[in-house]
């Protein structure tokens, strides 16, 4: 019997800014708290989350340390999505 359903395709890809916001919200932190924990100026947190400024290696490392994750998770969020797509 042929299935009536087709396999879903992955559509959601996250930007670095979306990953930063998601991690911050999962921790229950305000932007000021993230600033305090990462050492990144509070005025730069919103622009980072909204992709108005480039993250760069140094900021990615600071954020990764604050979130206790590998910097690649922040800098290359599309990599994991590509790996999952290839495995499907």
Q: PLM features: residue spans?
A:
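Short, charged recognition helix plus adjacent turn
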Residues: 1-10, 65, 75-88
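DNA major-groove recognition helix of helix-turn-helix/homeodomain DNA-binding modules
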Residues: 58-73
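A short, Lys/Arg-rich alpha-helix, primarily the initiator
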Residues: 2-26
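Recognition helix of helix-turn-helix/homeodomain-like DNA-binding domains
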Residues: 39-55
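Short, solvent-exposed alpha-helical "recognition" segments
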Residues: 52-57, 83-85
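Residue-level recognition of specific faces of alpha-helices
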Residues: 19, 44-47, 73
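Short basic helix-loop element that most often maps to the first helix and adjoining turn
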Residues: 18-37, 62
């Amino acid at each position: 019997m042929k299935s009536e359903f087709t396999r879903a395709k992955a559509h959601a890809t996250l930007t670095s800014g979306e990953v930063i916001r998601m991690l911050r919200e999962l921790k229950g932190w305000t932007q000021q708290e993230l600033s305090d924990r990462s050492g990144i100026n509070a005025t730069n947190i919103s622009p980072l989350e909204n992709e108005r400024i480039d993250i760069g290696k140094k900021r990615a490392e600071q954020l990764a340390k604050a979130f206790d994750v590998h910097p690649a998770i922040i800098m290359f969020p599309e990599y994991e999505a590509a790996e999952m797509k290839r495995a499907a």
